[in-house]
Amino acid sequence: MPETPNKVLIIGSGPIIVGQAAEFDYSGSQACKALREEGVEVVLVNSNPATIMTDPNMADRVYLEPLDARIVAKIIEEERPDGILPTLGGQTGLNIAVELDEMGVLEEYDVEVLGTSVETIVRAEDRDEFRAFMKKIGEPVCASEAVSSVEEAKEVAEEIGYPVVVRPAYTLGGTGGGIAEDEEELKRVVERGLEYSRVNQVLIEEYVGGWAEIEYEVMRDGSGNCITVCSMENVDPMGVHTGESIVVAPAQTLTEEEHQMLRSAALHIIDALGVEGGCNIQFALHRETGEYRVIEVNPRVSRSSALASKATGYPIARIAAKIAIGLRLDEIENQVTGETYAAFEPALDYVVVKIPRWPFDKFPEANRTLGTEMKSVGEVMAIGRTFEEALQKAIRSLEIGEPGLGPSPEELEADPEEIRRKIETPNDRRIFCIYAALKRGLMSVEEISELSGIDPWFVEKVKRIVEMEHEIVRRKDELLEFIRTGEADEETVEFVREVKRTGFSDEQIAELLGVDEDEIREARLGVGVEATYKLVDTCAAEFAAVSPYFYSTYEEECEALRYD
């Protein structure tokens, strides 16, 4: 291992804003702990006092200052750190590191950028450099060109053909970007994008709407060892920002050939870029032809990193921080198992679903259409043995008054054309409208998939929840008798267990049967239908777990120790 720096400056992510929620605080807190474990003095600069990372016991010294390059330069002058770690504070940290380098501050005070170098950051964040580098290493990208004016944008858009995607450089959450269907819309989006870009640059890109969006979270150390932490699949197709889409991990609809193709491409890209630490790589995949495009590379801990970390139990930010000070993947112990190392790729024997949380309840007049720019202010994550179970758990966690997946009374009575429009156009109620269409028999799985661009596999899973609801209602008399007497035959008990495995809450079942929620709970517990707990241990039970965490489900075997 190389010589460890004595003092490191970590750049925090600042306030919680649209597109940037608490995931970066989670990452920064992990990093502070990881560096102090190695005896490194940690100096933290963050403008947000309402975070975990600014707690007194997280860093040796905390500066609550605006996240501005000139202010960070003064802190560097005062503290004289050996290194700066900018990859844990989201886009803000990267932008400040690049500005400090351009100002000559890092060279003047002999401060090393730890982990991913400034050159690599620029190569991934500058739209022109990224496109040129991907072509150089033989990875396919969308036809695109970086521009700095509206007139240039018009010329490029005419050449590529409408619609086009506008992506500002050095921004987070698609801020300032969008999809332009015509010249008038292009002018509006480009003007806004240039205003938001730190370097007055936007990328005009070929639109691959309807292609599947797949992400890989990848780790690499300074010796070139690489692993994939996990794959993630957006339920919505390309055209909706990954932070605005329901995301499932691991990817559910990829063939083995597609998975290996994209995994190999992800490892090739992180190695060629020379990223040291965590990296998120986004792909667009055409199902029919098998073609793919590299959409974006985030050479930092990102929103998706926080999801991948919690989904797998693999502490990405902690390991990225240790890699930044010179440790290799095979030197960093996996704290969950206590006997494997960070070079061991996580294995998942469960399904994780992430759903964004939009503030439309606070802003009822806002435009609810979703696109390439984020509108959500947070997200929830749920774990289950099946996609259906995890999806219903996640919907309950949103705290929007829904006990699970099901349409609102308005959606049950809405005009069929209104339901079709809401399925065709991405919006926060799309998954509920798909449920309504299936429940009302308005559309088939194939029609919904064709209209929305959502893979039929996901629509089939929603259909299974609808069918389970119908079956509960069909067996209403039998279930009410069970609730009244507390007695049931084996078939009924197994049916109740299957209902719970599909993610139905006691409240949902009670609403369908017209009884009290407590009656459902009492009856099922009386016949042994109770939650069991399964491990999130990074290795699918291949090794014993020292410090795992658990998720609840309704299988026979419980992996948690019971204390009666």
From Swiss-Prot:
Q: Where are the stretches annotated Oligomerization domain?
A: 400-560
Please name the GO terms of the biological process aspect recorded for this protein, alphabetically: 'de novo' UMP biosynthetic process; glutamine metabolic process; L-arginine biosynthetic process
For this UniProt entry, the molecular function terms from Gene Ontology, in alphabetical order, are: ATP binding; carbamoyl-phosphate synthase (ammonia) activity; carbamoyl-phosphate synthase (glutamine-hydrolyzing) activity; metal ion binding
Free-text remark on how the cofactor is bound: Binds 2 Mg(2+) or Mn(2+) ions per subunit.
User: Which annotated residues bind Mn(2+) 2?
Assistant: E296, N298
Q: Name one GO cellular component term.
A: cytoplasm
**Name of the top EC class for this enzyme:** ligase
How is the subunit organization of this protein annotated in UniProt?
Answer: Composed of two chains; the small (or glutamine) chain promotes the hydrolysis of glutamine to ammonia, which is used by the large (or ammonia) chain to synthesize carbamoyl phosphate. Tetramer of heterodimers (alpha,beta)4.
Q: What task does this protein carry out? A: Large subunit of the glutamine-dependent carbamoyl phosphate synthetase (CPSase). CPSase catalyzes the formation of carbamoyl phosphate from the ammonia moiety of glutamine, carbonate, and phosphate donated by ATP, constituting the first step of 2 biosynthetic pathways, one leading to arginine and/or urea and the other to pyrimidine nucleotides.
Sequence similarity: Belongs to the CarB family.
Recorded hits in PANTHER family, A to Z, give: CARBAMOYL-PHOSPHATE SYNTHASE [AMMONIA], MITOCHONDRIAL, CARBAMOYLTRANSFERASE FAMILY MEMBER
Question: What is the name of the protein in this document?
Answer: Carbamoyl phosphate synthase large chain, N-terminal section
- What organism is recorded for this protein? Methanopyrus kandleri (strain AV19 / DSM 6324 / JCM 9639 / NBRC 100938)
Upper lineage ranks? Archaea, Methanobacteriati, Methanobacteriota, Methanomada group, Methanopyri
The record's gene field reads carB1
